[in-house]
Amino acid sequence: MSWKVPMLVGLVVLGTHIWTINKEFLDVTKDLDYFVASVEFAVAQFNDNNSEENTYRLLEVGRAQKKTWTMIFLMDLEMGRTICKKHDENIHNCPLLQGSGEKKVHCVFQVDARPWFSHFTVLTSTCVPT
């Protein structure tokens, strides 16, 4: 009988943990200020870390979520290769490359936002060509 109580407590704790993992990220609106800033940071980091000469620009935001009790954002972004080079002055309105140079990527980012310090960190990023 005495072994049943710890077993029951263990099952309750495990069940609660599994339930909270599923609820860890909640949907947010795509125009939330800190989310928008995190998206811009993720795209800039992608361009900085990408070995290609051309920059990419945001085409579409898919998933927009925030981790409960934090400022960690989870986002799905579709980006397209532009005609602009990394060192061009105004890369925000660059047209997309067409034809043989056309390329799109789908990325999932987790960004930790500390906007009150103007500090953002990409925690994870995974990108695949589409």
Swiss-Prot record:
Main localization of the protein described in the UniProt heading: secreted
Keyword Disulfide bond among UniProt keywords: yes
A GO-annotated cellular component: extracellular region
Disulfide bonds listed in the record: C84-C94, C107-C127
Pfam family, one: Cystatin
SMART domains: CY
Signal peptide residue numbers: 1-23
Subcellular location, record wording: Secreted
Entry keyword Secreted: yes
Gene Ontology MF annotations: cysteine-type endopeptidase inhibitor activity
Domain Cystatin residues, every copy: 37-116
Keywords annotated in UniProt: Disulfide bond, Protease inhibitor, Secreted, Signal, Thiol protease inhibitor
InterPro entries reported for this sequence: Cystatin_dom, Cystatin_sf, Cystatin_spermatogenesis
Family: Belongs to the cystatin family.
Protein function: May play a specialized role in spermatogenesis.
Listed name of the protein: Cystatin domain-containing protein 1
Organism this protein belongs to: Rattus norvegicus
Taxonomic lineage of the native organism: Eukaryota, Metazoa, Chordata, Craniata, Vertebrata
